[in-house]
Amino acid sequence: MSNINTQTTGALSAEMKTYYGMELLENAKPALVHNQFAATRGVPVGGGKTVEWRKFGSFEKALTPLTEGVTPDGSGISVSYITKELSQYGDYTTVSDMLDLTAIDDVVLEITDRHGANMGLTLDTVTRNEIQQGTKVIYAPTINADGSETEVLHRYELGKANKLTAALVARAATALKKMNAPTFDGKYVCILHPSVAFDLRNDPDWIAAHQYAAATELFSGEIGELHGVRFVETTEAKIFRGKALCQDSFTLTAANNAANGTVTVSEKMAVGALAGRQVLVNGVKVGVLDNTDSMLMLEDNITCAAGDIIYPAEGGAEGGAVYGCLFIGKGAYGVIDLSEGTEVIVKPRGSSGTADPLDQRSSVGWKGVHAAAILYDEYILRVECGSSYSEEDMAN
């Protein structure tokens, strides 16, 4: 915590510098769910804007018996490097006539608390968006009324019938084991959204496993363990869902039959607003080249009938939310240490010179550098699923 600096151009006491810095960091930590499972490293001193992680290869099995008195050839170690450019983030708030330089100020403290939470959410989102790009993915199968399963191959097919189940958890854990992914004290970790956790908690296998077991929480946000996986809940777990297509509506209605690359709709759209978007027409995902106020120009020819419903295709079936549940092995990804390169900046009244001639303004803010990178893609598995709340939750 001593590396969190409070910088001013005025005469803040050493006590206040330390206090505000600690407040910022402590309020950031609860939001940093995605960072707590990363391999951390410090900001490189004199290393420019690039941070580097070393990735070591494995040795082959040494199956050749040793010969007495003969020293065998040793094995070399392969080392590769993963680099990421550092980026700087920050925000501030201007306060009028409120900063007291002689004591801890309640208003500034409250603002610092808010900025600490904002910093945590910002840097956590940067990390989340990076590690959600892993290439290993499983789509939750559709659970039919008779209990049978139907395989799903695309995100846009996922809906409320594609929940995260105990069986799917076991499948994900097995996949990580087969890749020899290291564990966190013998367990893997899954970061999931509360909407997904709701469904999992109602799974009979989860209920049976937690009926008598006393939970031991090791991680912030942990809700329980199943099949060798510890589950950590956060509202910042990734949700994939497209935005509204027309005003506040997530649907459009085909106004007539179509069998080519244009579809006339009944609603009035903002001209050009859907260019570059993806839509679902009769369950087929297609890109939008452009739109008038009543017509979609699509990348491919499609067939639809008057009255067919058109949905956003960036999420799940019928435009619903899809949740990215991250199953993680130890060392899968790396981040910059939060306690380095992060500052809370308090500028008291009178520090701005001619820019504030009447000494009316003070400011409180934060800035920091951050970077995240996947180190071992095979140690991260993303399970994409729907939930009971797929019709309600929005993208984040």
What are these regions (language model features)?
Residues 51-56, 60, 65, 76-78, ...:
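Extended assembly-interface regions of large multimeric machines
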Residues 76-103, 328-330, 336-341:
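Short acidic, glycine/tyrosine-flanked loop/strand segments centered on an H-E-D-like triad
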Residues 47, 52, 58, 87-103, ...:
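Structured, hydrophobic secondary-structure cores that serve as assembly/anchoring elements
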Residues 1-85, 380:
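N-terminal "assembly arms/tails" that initiate or stabilize quaternary assembly
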Residues 102-178, 195, 251, 256-257, ...:
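Alpha-helical scaffold segments that mediate packing/assembly in large oligomeric complexes
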Residues 57, 97, 368-372:
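Beta-strand elements of well-folded, non-transmembrane domains
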Residues 2-37, 151-174, 197-396:
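Sequence/fold signature of self-assembling virion shell proteins
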